[in-house]
Every structure is written in C-alpha cells, then in structure tokens.
From Swiss-Prot:
It comes from Humicola insolens. It is found in: Secreted. Combining xylanase Xyn11A and xylosidases Xyl43A and/or Xyl43B leads to the release of reducing sugars as high as 1.29 folds of the sum of that released by each enzyme, which contributes to the formulation of optimised enzyme mixtures for the efficient hydrolysis of plant biomass. GO terms for molecular function: xylan 1,4-beta-xylosidase activity. It comes from the Eukaryota. GO terms for biological process: polysaccharide catabolic process. Bifunctional beta-xylosidase/alpha-L-arabinosidases with a low level of xylanase activity. Is most active on 4-nitrophenyl beta-D-xylopyranoside (pNPX) (defined as 100%), moderate on p-nitrophenyl-alpha-L-arabinofuranoside (pNPA) (23.7%), and weak on beechwood xylan (15.9%) and birchwood xylan (15.2%). Is able to attack xylooligosacchardies with degrees of polymerisation of 2-5, releasing the amounts of reducing sugars in the order of xylopentose > xylotetraose > xylotriose > xylobiose, i.e. the rate of xylose released from xylooligosacchardies increased with the chain length. This is Xylosidase/arabinosidase 43A. Its EC number is 3.2.1.37, 3.2.1.55. Optimum temperature is 50 degrees Celsius. Optimum pH is 6.5. Keywords: Carbohydrate metabolism, Glycosidase, Hydrolase, Polysaccharide degradation, Secreted. Belongs to the glycosyl hydrolase 43 family.
C-alpha cells in the first residue's frame, strides 16, 4: 500500500467528509536531532497542513492546502503540535489540537475557520479543563458533539489519576498502573458546548469491558487496553470506539450503545506496522468505509517520519469490523 501523501511526512490522520470532499487533518512530522525516547520528545511537530481529495478508488490527486496553523500563532503553546482533529457546525470549521503549554503540560486547543481547508485562527487559551492529548470530536445524529481524548506515557493521562485538573508530576514519563487487580486507565470524554469551543460538562472516564468477563480491562492487558489515539464512529446505531494499544502496536475497537460507553472490546483492526505508533481514523466516503493510518515505510523506518496510508474496511453480519470483504 503506497503512502497517500508524499510531499511531506504526515501522521495521525483524522479524515472527514465535508461538502462531498474528503479532508485529512494530520500532524506534520519533521526532521529533528532529538533522540528517540518513550516520552515522545522526538515528535517535535510545529505546524499543521490540511489535505483534500475527491476520490479514493482510485485515489485522486491530493491537494496540500499548506500551513493552516503553527506554534507561533498560539499564545499558550510552547511546542509539540500533536495529533489533531476537525469538526463542523453552522458553517464554521473547528480544528482541535493538543500541545504543551508554557509549563510543559499538554492541553487541548481549538482554532476556527470559515473553510474546511483553513487557515485556522486559534482561541487564545486552551479549552478549560482539558488535558492530555489526541482529541477526537464526534458529532452524533442529534447534533451533540463529544470530545474523546487521552494518551499514556508522554501524553500524560496517567498523571490525572487523582482527578480532573489534578496533575501529579510523580507519574510523568513512561508510566502507567500495573500489577494484579489494577484496572486500565480509560480514555476521557466530554460533551462540547453549542459553540464547539468548551466542555459543557465534567470530563468523564470511559470504561472498556472485556467480553469474556464483562469486567473492565486490566492494566496489564497491554494487547487490549487503551493507550492513545481515540476515535469514534457510528454504524447501524452502535458506537464504535477505536484506539491504539501503544506499546503493543495494535489498532483495536470496542462497541457500545451510548457515546459515553461502556464499550465492550471487539477485536483488532490493524496489526503492528513499521514504526512505533499507530494512530488512525475511520470514515464513510462515497458509500464505502475507510481506515486511515500511518507507518514509516517512506522514511525507511525512521520512527518520527511517518506517512499517511488508507485501506478499505468492512463489517460482517454481526457488525464486527473486518479487513477483507465478507463473502
């Protein structure tokens, strides 16, 4: 499978269909002298590009709309514009992004445009009560919008075990709960306000259940527990929450009846690829379902120089996601 974008290195693709066209909102990888570490310091991204195309089969020419937002534009940000997402409401387009503030703590910001391709104007402060990384915004059928977020280790989610807005620096770095009886840390969700720029409620923790027991996944279940890269989509009235398992490099999903969960683990979507991280999105476009992800094939394995790829996915008669077309 060839990379979809080759003019620059891109990762963490959030794909959306706006006005009949497919738009991709990735992070922008760049060369750096920072050494690889489990905190993710080598992912030193400084701006965002937006891409668009008219078809996927065959792929049409990809348009790079250029830099739409950069670190220098955002008063509260110090560095690391990591995986973004986008949403639309009432003719406005919103770009959601994580970044480190001046104290080195990850927050989530929002920037606004009149066009899906930007450029985007950032709000001067991060979303109040936001923390960690990997925002993914899902707009339900009734127009309600929800933000899913969180990431372990360098994403700092494990630093908030004492509660929302209580940052425990002792948990900084590549750490997470472990050991007998420890439950996996869940991703976070909050409904957004009508203007799409703040949380409308207290942030909640999502519970992902093991199908064989109905109990929350254990912290030591690294093949299934949440690590980062939240995404939500809906199919046949069910909510599909997908995510990366991080250090085991799987893309997996869980299914529930509410945007708040709980979600029951459903299986793997993608096996490990070349490169440390897996981050994705799932979107319906022109009547077919597509999985966007990234790997390091184009850079010949350089971990922080990734490239967006896309593959088709399907659902079987039971609603399970499959990567080969059912008979």
């Amino acid at each position: 499978m060839a990379p979809l974008i080759t003019n620059i290195y891109t990762a963490d693709p959030s794909a959306h269909v706006f006005n009949g066209k497919l738009y991709i909102y990735p992070s922008h990888d760049r060369e750096t002298d920072i050494q690889f570490n489990d905190n993710g310091d080598q992912y030193d991204m400084a701006d965002y590009h937006v891409f668009s195309l008219d078809s996927l089969d065959p792929p049409s020419e990809v348009t790079d709309h250029g830099v739409v937002l950069k670190v220098e534009d955002i008063p509260w940000v110090s560095k690391q514009l990591w995986a973004p997402d986008a949403a639309t409401k009432d003719g406005k387009y919103y770009l959601y992004f994580p970044a480190r503030d001046k104290e080195g703590i990850f927050r989530i910001g929002v920037a606004v445009s009149d066009k899906p391709e930007g450029p985007f104007t950032p709000d001067p402060e991060p979303i109040k009560g936001s923390y960690s990384i990997d925002p993914a915004v899902f707009v339900d059928d009734d127009g309600s919008a929800y933000m899913y977020f969180g990431g372990l280790w360098g994403g700092q989610l494990q630093c908030y075990q004492k509660g929302n807005n209580i940052f425990d620096a002792e948990w900084s770095g590549p750490k997470e709960p472990s050991g007998s009886g420890a439950k996996a840390l869940g991703p976070r969700v909050a409904k957004l306000t009508d203007d799409m720029r703040q949380f409308a409620e207290e942030v909640r923790e999502i519970v992902i259940l093991a199908p064989e027991t109905g109990e929350p996944l254990a912290a030591d279940d690294h093949d299934r527990r949440f690590f980062e890269a939240a995404w939500m989509h809906k199919y046949n009235g069910k909510y599909y929450f997908s995510y990366s398992t991080g250090d085991t490099h799987y893309l997996v999903y869980a299914v529930g009846d509410s945007p708040y969960g709980p979600f029951t683990y459903g299986g793997r979507i993608l096996e490990p690829v070349l490169g440390w991280t897996t981050h994705h999105s799932i979107v319906e476009f022109q009547g077919r379902w597509w999985l966007f992800h990234h790997d390091c094939e184009l850079s010949k394995g350089v971990d922080h120089l990734r490239s967006v790829k896309v593959k088709e996915i399907w659902y079987d008669k039971d609603g399970k996601i499959v990567t080969e077309k059912p008979e």
